[in-house]
Amino acid sequence: EQSFIAFLEDSIQKNWDLDALTDYKGATLQYKDVARKIEKLHIIFELSGIKKGDKIAVCGRNSSHWGVTFLATITYGAVIVPILHEFKADNIHNIVNHSEAKLLFVGDQAWENLNEDAMPLLEGIASLADFSSLVSRNEKLTYAFEHRNAIYGQRYPKNFRPEHICYRKDRPEELAIINYTSGTTGYSKGVMLPYRSLWSNTKFAFEVLDLQAGDKIVSMLPMAHMYGLAFEFLYEFSVGCHIYFLTRMPSPK
């Protein structure tokens, strides 16, 4: 059965205590930490009224929290809109508006140049650094950000365990990602990618690449591009690899 999300669920459960994501000169998340962060984002989405099929944008350098945001969005049933952080502010505003994103998760550098008033459809903006709320335009969202840890604690008094994971099953033709290209003329154009595309690329990688759980890899290409996303993050995460992110470019000695 073709389910991309099943790859993710299977990997998190099997590799629970293995290292998953590390930021350059930053913290390491194990697969269980990723699962727990996904769960807290699901609580925010649920309490703030995000529905299946709603769009959630992410814009920032590759990082552990970029990956967590991506995984939380698709396992919830929302559509992820990855945006290259190098895009100019008016292009980012345009993509957020054109995609009709309800939430934007943004890195510190990208956020400095953005203007929230230029993105009127957003219900909220959150920081990729620590998942704190930067802008909230509805009370439910404000409540969700303030109470996510308390609600998580009520739901999982003995913490979140592998058996708690029961992600939805995706359908091959269901929309997973809207990927905006670097527009050569005018603004970027959105490419609509179904789950079939994620599943087939990941399955292809399983067949031709030979990574094992616990192997270490560096994610260098931007995850807002499909190639970097598919072959330096999604496949490796599905295998149980330990992925390192260059959250900033190392300066040459």
Where are these regions (language model features)?
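Flexible, non-catalytic linker and terminal segments flanking ANL/adenylate-forming cores
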Residues: 1-2
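Conserved AMP-binding/adenylate-forming core of the ANL superfamily
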Residues: 9, 17-71, 88-93, 190-196
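Conserved pre-ATP/AMP-binding loop-to-beta segment of ANL
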Residues: 16-17, 143-180, 187, 210-216
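Conserved AMP-binding A3 loop
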Residues: 30-32, 167-168, 176-200
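Conserved structural elements of the adenylate-forming
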Residues: 35-40, 172, 191-212, 217
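Structural core segment of the AMP-binding/adenylate-forming
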Residues: 48, 75-153
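A short helix-loop-beta submotif of the ANL/AMP-binding
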Residues: 55, 61-81, 85-89, 97-103, ...
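Conserved AMP-binding/adenylation subdomain of ANL enzymes
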Residues: 199-216, 223-253
